[in-house]
């Protein structure tokens, strides 16, 4: 009995992590359902998908935000295309400037989709490696006994035997409908059973792909949907992808079809949750903005307050806000506004301007008050 050695110059850096996550879930479900149970292996594949998608949650949220930003900026992008359509270099510079202004990177929006590619390849290779009696590209051609005595990455030879023995009504989880070779590796194989189990799984995977694409398209803005390129991609996602799943299903192991179905179910639910969360955040931001405007708005019936940028007008050292009436009361702003204010000007001191006695001034134009005299109002 042996396990596969780790090869640092191969894709083992992908195969081993994927196999390890699947192995953990398999051990948990096998403890309840049994090691050779079809649903124990099926659930391990499904929860492998859920685990990887949960790890990619934050990049997925960033992808949704980037997509929404791109839709909001479509009018400006089309304006740039009309203006610099013939100058590709200038167009690229203006697009980079627009992206920097709004702080987003379109490449980040593709990260979740790109990250799933090596995961899919890793799972596909790990599932194929359970049955090495078929040979083929990158696979040794082993006998049935040698195959059951060889481990599969983190799976022991005993686990390999349990995988090959797991079936539903004679349909092994690692078999596919058009399989012609490697049938002896399974303890029980029935092609009608594989077709009977595989067709509903294909249809469900295709339907899940369709509704997932439909939900994504429904959340696009009207301006984005009017773009010819976007409209073409929407049609491909809405019709070609689901059709491709159904057509390609007979050539894929049942576990891969289950992987595709689980991935689309998770994406549909996660997409609905993330869009609802982002819409609530946007609504909360709008509500806070309205509350700030309401708090800063003047009370009903009140006059707006003006802040003067000039020095306060004063008469003989008394400002408008500190004027005292004849009866000793402090004047309000409205009463002070009714006073004819005369600004004090400085003139050259001449003998005629000098007072002839203490507290009096001979200059009739001077407004210097006598000592102890109160300022009086002039009625308009």
From Swiss-Prot:
Residues 367-380 have a biased composition (Basic residues). It is found in: Cell membrane. GO terms for cellular component: plasma membrane. Residues 287-308, 326-380 are annotated as: Disordered. One of its GO terms (molecular function) is membrane insertase activity. It comes from the Bacteria. InterPro entries: YidC/ALB3/OXA1/COX18 (IPR001708), YidC/Oxa/ALB_C (IPR028055), YidC_ALB_C (IPR047196). Keywords: Cell membrane, Chaperone, Membrane, Protein transport, Transmembrane, Transmembrane helix, Transport. One of its GO terms (biological process) is protein insertion into membrane. It is a multi-pass membrane protein. Pfam families: 60KD_IMP. Belongs to the OXA1/ALB3/YidC family. Type 1 subfamily. Interacts with the Sec translocase complex via SecD. Specifically interacts with transmembrane segments of nascent integral membrane proteins during membrane integration. Required for the insertion and/or proper folding and/or complex formation of integral membrane proteins into the membrane. Involved in integration of membrane proteins that insert both dependently and independently of the Sec translocase complex, as well as at least some lipoproteins. Aids folding of multispanning membrane proteins. PANTHER family: CYTOCHROME C OXIDASE ASSEMBLY PROTEIN COX18, MITOCHONDRIAL, OXA1. This is Membrane protein insertase YidC. The lineage of its organism: Bacteria, Bacillati, Actinomycetota, Actinomycetes, Mycobacteriales. The gene is yidC.
